[in-house]
């Protein structure tokens, strides 16, 4: 019989790794709560139409990368490839904008059929923020600052913020025609993917990773030259706000986002430590998405961070596992019952308690206790039960405290002793 394994690009998150993820999520929860954000959770499975309308029929995501299928009712369904369109759908469906602008965050798995690489899998996880119903440039700056400061809270310092203005729809439409003419004159010099995109999604060519195409694009028309005075004023003010917030940035006029719904502000936060997968956070303004999906006109801005890449970058800063405060060692039937009772009692005091289940000798249990890196071992044997006593032995830093390595005490004094020994 063939051994069953996970699908390619869909990885198990093992206990040694999950603790780092939990740390990042706890930092996110605290950071976003301080920023006044509320969490929203949407289904993993959505109607395919949500993404074809919201993201754009001509994007790589919709055209090449989605996991789509017909369910047993004949409905076309898709495993969500990103989080913004589902959040937009939920806001419209439940009328959340009737209560005013929404400041939301989300987390969860996404799915894209891509070639798996370090930090990029077919099932991947994102944490994202969406400000919906806010048009102010101040909201752009605040959203960027939330991302920047969250990454700092996680412990990342070697980061680069790149920003660009994609202008209004009118700005982009004029620029697209100029860019298409320029590219068509140099068609044979473009890589194959870029040739396919000229008439479908020419702006995406600006983000080409092909070296020869990138070199050619250095002479291409710049979207910045086609921005209206209103769009330029908006972009200038964003830069002023970022300077005031002491957030360093670089302008990248070739920065475009891979989804069609973006306008005006676009940004990425990158790291040199991820190789070709340099982007840690990407986002921008999407003023037309809510109305495109059938809702009211609601200018919005948001971003998403890939958890896999974030955990890789954070490394040892978040992967330090917590050792037990107390490892409970026991031998004998009566001792077993008391050990379980005391374990549950101590856990209710917010302590990390590990209970030995091996039933082996005291010496072997002590070896496991030492391997767990617990600070103390609580020893319960038949003798201790008959005498109504418990024994606490220190496991760490023994050489520093030889005089107080052991404590013998009654069960009634347990809470008081624990408070004394484990501050």
UniProtKB/Swiss-Prot annotation:
Keywords: Aminoacyl-tRNA synthetase, ATP-binding, Cytoplasm, Ligase, Nucleotide-binding, Protein biosynthesis. InterPro entries: aa-tRNA-synth_II (IPR006195), aa-tRNA-synth_II/BPL/LPL (IPR045864), Anticodon-bd (IPR004154), Anticodon-bd_dom_sf (IPR036621), His-tRNA-ligase (IPR015807), HisRS-like_core (IPR041715), HisRS/HisZ (IPR004516), HisRS_anticodon (IPR033656). GO terms for biological process: histidyl-tRNA aminoacylation. The gene is hisS. One of its GO terms (cellular component) is cytoplasm. Homodimer. Belongs to the class-II aminoacyl-tRNA synthetase family. This is Histidine--tRNA ligase. Its EC number is 6.1.1.21. GO terms for molecular function: ATP binding; histidine-tRNA ligase activity. NCBIfam families: hisS. It is an enzyme of class 6 (ligase).
